Amino acid sequence: MYPPPPAPAPHRDFISVTLSLGESYDNSKSRRRRSCWRKWKQLSRLQRNVILFVLGFLILCGFLYSLQVSDQWKALSGSRAEVEKMKLEVLPVLPAPQKESAEPEGFADILSQKRQRHLRRGPPHLQIRPPNTVSKDGMQDDAKEREAALGKAQQEENTQRTVISWRGAVIEPEQATEPPSKRAEASIKPLFLASRIWKEPAPPNERQKGVIEAFLHAWKGYQKFAWGHDELKPVSKTFSEWFGLGLTLIDALDTMWILGLKQEFKEARKWVSENLDFQKNVDVNLFESTIRILGGLLSAYHLSGDSLFLSKAEDFGNRLMPAFTTPSKIPYSDVNIGTGFAHSPQWTSDSTVAEVTSIQLEFRELSRLTGIKKFQEAVEEVTKHIHSLSGKKDGLVPMFINTNSGLFTHPGVFTLGARADSYYEYLLKQWIQGGKKETQLLEDYVRAIEGIKAHLLRQSQPRKLTFVGELAHGRFSAKMDHLVCFLPGTLALGVHHGLPADHMDLARALMETCYQMNQQMETGLSPEIAHFNMYPRADHKDVEVKPADRHNLLRPETVESLFYLYRVTKDRKYQDWGWEILQSFNKYTRVPSGGYSSINNVQNSHKPEPRDKMESFFVGETLKYLYLLFSDDLELLGLDTCVFNTEAHPLPIWSPA
């Protein structure tokens, strides 16, 4: 018998318990999180690094954008009230110093014409910017920062300032040139008749006739293809707009008068009367529009005596005033002349030092002529502020200044090229304009020249040409912009007005260098930027040009300085050098159908490559200075009678010494 089978094992039940530590089970949410982490871990190291880099870059961009937005909001704090306060005023324009019935010679037929309605031209794609607001706390912080910086600068000046003397003359404590008082506003008259800065010159000589012919050729192209527009594009026979205000026409008004082109002047004057309307929704650059438009109108008024130009100048000056509604009173770079909204560029809240310190001649003169003191007060506040700032190096200034804090930015970089050049020029010219009374201006100018000698002056090899380089955080760069060629002329002007004789030695040396910057090029025209060889090397010239810098924009700085050097020294070699440059312009930049074009390559006489643009300063400055350089009459717009703004527009000296 088989034994009975064993009894089956008893059935066991198992219970699974999940300890969640108080957290409820939510189906699959936690599992999904763990799944994402596992997916991340499954990525390669390269993939994870790329994702992290992109995320970091986006976070950084967001942070920088928030800072920029914060700056813009701070900058516009309280702007509504100030803009309303400075809304375009319609103030009575004081008449020119002449009888109502008197008219400039040869203008009776124009002045009697009725004003006609015109078709308004507006630049394409205008952008309207709404005004912004900002917190008061930001403004208070900026104000405290400015106050601390200015206090430090004042303390430094009190300990370091010395009395400067030249040729035995001691500079007295500053005598400010006061703006017109309120009491005088109703009765003030323009102090200078047209005859004070203008007299009919002798008939033009042969070289001057060459300049007149060049101007008429340029003007033919402008009249035919760009009349009433900003700039001529002579190769394509069309035009380009910047502000849509007839920039070339206004810039050339005084040139036509000086060259004796009265018929062309009449036609341009008619356009100004009938078509120049500033009530348009367009942004203009404060600096460029001041030196070209405001300066051009004031100069045309002084030369012709025609009150139309003064009326237009006052209107335009009023429309520029909102640019000064910043927390620091350092003006914005741009202003909409139709809406009155002023602002910094989109990419920064900085203005350049040259821009904010090279509008003073024009605004001061506008106050003097109209009796409206706000123009002069606004720009002189800027001048005093810059004078008091720390961050300079022996009189040299950085290139940028913040409109919110009023402090220099990008410190340690010093140049006499773009963004700083005309600061130094206007120190001297304001001193001359005001009758040599504002010694603070002269003091800053003389100190700056000493700073140039100490830090920026070098000599090239092998010909030992003296040049002005740049300094960046203690490191010298042998780079010189063509713009720096304004300096020899400014130095010579200072010597003419009594500054040290060694300034003339430097002026002569730099003038030779600027001439060689033209002479050593195959076309005889200077590049935009030159680099100088400082070490003896075989087969190396003193002047070297990089491919990106070898263009020529028809700039005036070299011939401007030739004009001053000839006026002061009477050395005819400077006239000869100017004649060579004019011939080079005719040979390599002249367009047969009319006009002159900037070129891409000054080192290729066979293919200079026209850029198809004639800047307004070619007819406003370059040809004007050449005409005056060739004049046999040294009293034609004499250096004791008028001072030229940085766009070559002559303005009268208030109290000739």
Swiss-Prot record:
Q: What is its EC number?
A: 3.2.1.113
> Which cofactor is recorded for it?
Ca(2+)
Q: Where is this region: Disordered?
A: 118-157
For this entry, the protein name equals Endoplasmic reticulum mannosyl-oligosaccharide 1,2-alpha-mannosidase
Q: What class of enzyme is it?
A: hydrolase
What is the originating organism of this protein? Answer: Rattus norvegicus (Rat)
Q: Which cysteines are joined by disulfide bonds?
A: C485-C514
GO BP field: carbohydrate metabolic process; ERAD pathway; mannoprotein catabolic process; protein glycosylation
Protein transport recorded as keyword: no
Which pathway is recorded for this entry?
Protein modification; protein glycosylation
Pfam families cross-referenced by the UniProt entry: Glyco_hydro_47 (PF01532)
Record flagged with keyword Transferase: no
Q: Which family does it belong to?
A: Belongs to the glycosyl hydrolase 47 family.
Q: What does the record say about its membrane topology?
A: Single-pass type II membrane protein
Basic and acidic residues bias (residue ranges):
138-157
